[in-house]
Amino acid sequence: MDKKVYQCTVSAPVNIAVIKYWGKRDVALNLPTNSSISVTLSQDDLRTVTTASCSEKFENDTLWLNGNAEEIFANKRLRVCVEELRKARLDLEEENDDLDKIGALKLHVVSENNFPTAAGLASSAAGYAAFCEAIARLYDLPWTPTQLSRIARQGSGSACRSLFGGYVAWEMGELHSGADSVAVQVEPVENWPEIRVAVLVASAAKKGVSSTAGMQATVASSTLFQHRIQNIVPQRIQEMKTAIRERDFETFAKLTMTDSNQFHACCLDTFPPIFYLNDTSRAVIRVVENINATAGKTIAAYTFDAGPNAVIYFLEENSEIVLNTLYAVTKNAEGWSKQYGSSPVTVDSAAANIVSSGISRVILTRVGNGPRVLTIDESLIDASGNPKFIGSH
């Protein structure tokens, strides 16, 4: 008889921080120097799909990411996640004789992103969230997203926030073990579904300084950073939670922009300095300022992670003015599904020229839900447990 292949397929979302995570107090456990808050983006537009499978016939624990195979145990972060999840399954099997004995079987995990990996679009967050969610579901672990977030965090810090939809906080915790450094939902999508998002991709090339290396250089050398984590972020976390709960966009927007600016100031204060923003990024900031000046209030907010791509938040009710303006300066970029009308905003001409030539792709999305379990039809492995390689989307 052919040996059975057990499998489960999930998708997980990208999240974009509005109060930034940057810096570890414990590198091995991925414990952060400060708490952070993010918005989960809709999986209709950006997602990682992962199938986790196990079988007696598999010889090695293997991950295929976008078609490239790697041994799971050769990657320390993947290995830590698998070891913890496997131990939890084996414990369940020891407690309950009726369970299939799958915990000790080798894993085949296949994962695909529908966006460029390592291009500043938080691919590791969605990737590790999907990886941990798929294996936890395969193993039928009776865990809450917060419990699973402790494991996902050890793969990629920001991944713990992709286990929830809506608005999510990664609480830094206090314990040396990291047991209390977990993600919690601040509010579900339903509390504030009107948030819209425009991602302006400035470069799909791999960034110069990786987040992992960059953040530890900042921790080691930036005096501004110490002020940030001790005196600024704790209050901002509380203010941001209140703004989200009260659906107060102006406060949400101001906190988002000032926190992005301070994060990049800390990068600049690192020695030697780290430059994630480029001329295109700075020009996008000008465009957002022009939009808000014309509106007479803050209706759009920019934020940048460890790369030049801009993420712009706005409310559905202001979509027309925001998108008409962005379209006017990026109409040659890929991703626009229709033409937009004229905008009342006068954009600084130098900024408009830089944005026009510097933005290659636009992704329009919105706040979205947490990981989904997908059907067998969407599985990335065939009946024998090998990748289908359906190709990139």
Curated annotation (Swiss-Prot):
State the EC number(s).
4.1.1.33
Q: Which reaction does it catalyse?
A: (R)-5-diphosphomevalonate + ATP = isopentenyl diphosphate + ADP + phosphate + CO2
User: Cytoplasm: is it a keyword of this entry?
Assistant: yes
What's the domain of life for this entry? Answer: Eukaryota
Annotated GO molecular function terms are: ATP binding; diphosphomevalonate decarboxylase activity
Gene Ontology CC terms, in alphabetical order = cytosol; nucleus
Q: What is its main location?
A: cytoplasm
Q: Which GO terms describe its biological process?
A: farnesyl diphosphate biosynthetic process, mevalonate pathway; isopentenyl diphosphate biosynthetic process, mevalonate pathway; sterol biosynthetic process
The enzyme class is lyase
Q: Coiled coil: present as a keyword of the record?
A: no
Pathway where this protein functions: Isoprenoid biosynthesis; isopentenyl diphosphate biosynthesis via mevalonate pathway; isopentenyl diphosphate from (R)-mevalonate: step 3/3
**Quaternary state and partners of this protein?**
Homodimer.
**Listed NCBIfam families:** mevDPdecarb
Q: Which family does it belong to?
A: Belongs to the diphosphomevalonate decarboxylase family.
Q: What is the protein named?
A: Diphosphomevalonate decarboxylase
Please name the gene that encodes this protein. Answer: mvd1
